[in-house]
Amino acid sequence: MNTVKQSNMISSFSKYFLLTLMGTQLMGQSNTPTRFALKTVIQDTFLTEGLSSNIVAEIRTLGDSLTWLGTGQGLALHDGHRIFAYQTSADSLKDGQFTKLVPQGGIPAIAVMGDTMAVAYSGDNGNIQVGYGVTLTYDAQDTSGITWTYLKQPVDNVADTLKPFGEGYYRQLPVTVPEANVTYDADLSGDFLWTASWAGGLRRYHLTKRAWENVPMPMDGQDSLSLCEGFDETTSDGKSVLPGYYLNPRDPGDGGNHNHKAFSVIAYGDTVWVGTANGVNKGIMIFEVNEVSPGIFEILNCIEWEHYSYPDDGLAGNFVVGLAKQLWNGQITIWAASLYADKPGESRGLSYTRDDGVTWNTTLLNERVYNVTTKDSLVFASTSSGLWKSHDGENWAKYSAAIDTAFLAHQQILTDLVYTSSLDERDTIPKLWIGTSDGVALSSDIHGASWSIFQTEYDTTEVYAYPNPFSPLSHNQLNGDGYVRFHTGEVYNTEIILDIFNFAMEKVYSENFNLNKFRGAVKWNGRGQTGALVSNGVYFARINFAYSANNSPKDFWTKIIVVK
């Protein structure tokens, strides 16, 4: 059986994304519009208030007030009041099946066009990421319950070695399994849902014909590819074939092409841009109907590709994990989040072109960029060090980590890392969403002055520490420290006293949180009073506060396991 061989690049990325799509998540209140109202029966049947994962990697606004969230453990939405998790189906869904529930899995991609929405799902088999398919709806604002069409992860048949596209046929290695075939990005434009599925390559789904097709792109050594002409080889049964072309997403050392590993995609009008493990591809879709003689018409339906890569075209790095289109003053800028691939001299950062790919520039070098969001002159870059904003693409300012400044809120995003951002312009004053590994936050303006934060609450009334076990070297990394958070529930006085004891009940740390002044999470960075990290072991936290208006402050105890 011909299948795609797992490569080192696939392995390393799958490990990263597995960590990305696992975690804990999310609940809260917001002041966004209230025009959308979920019916109670829908809440009870298909939605559960709060979320199951703090990891939020996708944010899409839709209609007057809906905001859809792609989390590490499923699909979620904010309806203008509260956050809900979409319930999942434990049963295996069939290709083309209508369903009110969605598949289990993390959400690597959400695409929206009007009321049409597509959501991709993924998981793992213990060794590698696996594509769980896509759900598609044409009425994403249906308050009586959305009807989804489930599309299984597209794969090829073993015999699919010669496929039609454009003005002829091309040869390919069939991708027959969902392993490493994960839809990491998707976009809706015109008649098509475009998907970038790594080993599954670039594919598009015709929304009317309800059919998938593979979309061939240039091989690694090609700077262009025409699917409109050049099909000069003829098979024994008369098919016109592209000579010397082979679609193969294996590694180059195994006969394949990094440029056939699609990871990011945007489409608009007659143009599609695709980021791969070997740069950026620009496709111009040609559709012409010409009358070649009276009553005889010739239809031309194809794509002309241009391929840009490091070092020849000036990209920062060839592994392009995110793409965005900016339209400002009549000029289109294409932004590409670039990582190292396999060529010496590559760097992380942003690559961009303002002249349709003719020339490329770089900025934010050495930053690990996940996603880019644009609006008019504004560019937002979501990175491992935080959210950056620019008005010109050259000068950048970084937001401080999100903190809820409301009195007694004591909520905070305890991570530098921002996976994604989204501008919400549906009210008079635009708002800003960010998705992180520690929840999702909504700013009341684009400046980040005041945040509402939504995070998982496992038990709203219990006192507990999380994550637990806790590693100060890897968990909740913020400004050089790692943190464990203490959940207290409602606090009815203005002081919280935190004491940390080792297993011998010797006090190693103490802090008083004056809630009249302090804003942020009740937390500990795993350090003792001297500033040094404590040793591995079991620790006990004593937290003193008043849990109701009619009670004096009292001590609450919880246990923490520190493992560096």
Regions found by a protein language model. Name each.
Residues 74-76, 130-136, 201-203, 279-282, ...:
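A short loop-to-beta-strand structural motif that recurs across blades of beta-propeller domains
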Residues 44-76:
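Beta-strand-rich domains and repeat architectures in extracellular enzymes and scaffolds
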Residues 540-564:
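C-terminal tail/sorting-segment detector
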Residues 44-48, 87-101, 146-177, 215-255, ...:
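Surface-exposed loop and turn segments in beta-propeller and other repeat-based domains
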